[in-house]
């Protein structure tokens, strides 16, 4: 299948990304990352060291035959497979994502499974797909008996987190986030656009309009990167929320050092994003000020550590 909006390609791609701190006390090494993400025996874990350590599991397919989410209640039906994978960044942050793409129409009757398995990660409608209704419905969340891609991502996350190699001793109190996304081809003459929305319950939604020919897998990679950096912002902001101005909190320096040791070096926007989609990240960063906020928080952490080091040197010793 081709890219978004091409004659042989899909008219819609949707997915969900879950992000959390790997439940272990220290960042794991490359060999351990490979063990964690070895979800299939017939395909190797992909490892990268540049621009940072990055491990990607083999893809897993989940067969579905159900109604897609719909804001209009349209009783459409899709059949095929959702593709999912797990990603580990610098041995420290774990992500699981699941996504699919869909063409505008399919056969009027359901075909045998062999027809669908030849197009992994594609859900083919029975008849026509109400694209706008499904796009809006996916972002709003699934109803009863509707496709729930988030549950596929969550199941994969739980599978990795149950691995016996993890010690479940977290160095930081962190939040878990979910990012739900849709992508459709931009109409002729329309510029690329991204609409990013945050909710208080850890859910983020991203609605994308992208150039014709954009590969759904590239969109999924972009949204994993957006989810990672949103999680970093959220987690560090949560740790700094209500930070006392004084030096009476003896446990505070340890919290600050943990942020430096485990998270501050992970900020690397677009590090694993397809080059054709770099401008989407840049547009979001320009409007939302993600990098500016990150730099301010990082400087605040370093200033607090320096201030506490200076104060500790000037405190009188017990014998004075």
Regions found by a protein language model. Name each.
Residues 225-227, 231-320:
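Membrane-associated alpha-helical segments
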Residues 55-81, 86, 210-212, 234-242, ...:
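Generic hydrophobic segment detector
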Residues 1-197:
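Short Lys/Arg-enriched alpha/beta "domain-start" segment
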Residues 182-234, 238-246:
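Extended, charged amphipathic alpha-helical segments
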């Amino acid at each position: 299948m081709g890219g978004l909006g091409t004659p042989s390609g899909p008219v819609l791609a949707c997915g969900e990304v879950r992000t959390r701190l790997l439940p272990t006390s220290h960042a794991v090494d490359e060999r351990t990352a490979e063990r964690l993400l070895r979800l299939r025996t017939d395909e190797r874990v992909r490892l990268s060291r540049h621009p940072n350590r990055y491990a990607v599991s083999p893809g897993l397919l989940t067969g579905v035959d159900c109604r897609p989410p719909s804001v209009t209640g349209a009783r459409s039906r899709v059949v095929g497979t959702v593709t999912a994978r797990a990603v580990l960044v610098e041995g420290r942050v774990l992500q699981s994502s699941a996504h699919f793409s869909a063409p505008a129409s399919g056969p009027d009757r359901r075909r045998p499974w062999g027809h669908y398995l030849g197009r992994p990660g594609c859900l083919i409608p029975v008849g026509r797909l109400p694209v706008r209704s499904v796009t809006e419905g996916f972002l709003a969340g699934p109803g009863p008996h509707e496709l729930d891609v988030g549950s596929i991502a969550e199941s994969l996350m739980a599978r990795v987190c149950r691995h016996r190699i993890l010690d479940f001793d977290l160095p930081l109190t962190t939040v878990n986030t979910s990012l739900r996304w849709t992508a459709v081809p931009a109409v002729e003459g329309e510029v690329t656009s991204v609409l990013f929305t945050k909710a208080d319950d850890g859910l983020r939604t991203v609605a994308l309009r992208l150039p014709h020919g954009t590969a759904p897998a590239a969109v999924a990679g972009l949204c994993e990167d957006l989810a990672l950096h949103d999680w970093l912002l959220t987690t560090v902001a949560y740790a700094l929320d209500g930070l006392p101005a004084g030096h009476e909190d003896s446990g505070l320096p340890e919290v600050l050092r943990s942020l430096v040791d485990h998270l501050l070096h992970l900020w690397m926007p677009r590090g694993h994003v397809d080059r054709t989609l770099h401008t989407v990240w840049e547009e979001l960063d320009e409007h939302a000020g993600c990098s500016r906020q990150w730099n301010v928080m990082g400087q605040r952490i370093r200033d607090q550590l320096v201030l506490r080091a200076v104060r500790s040197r000037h405190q009188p010793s017990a014998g004075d």
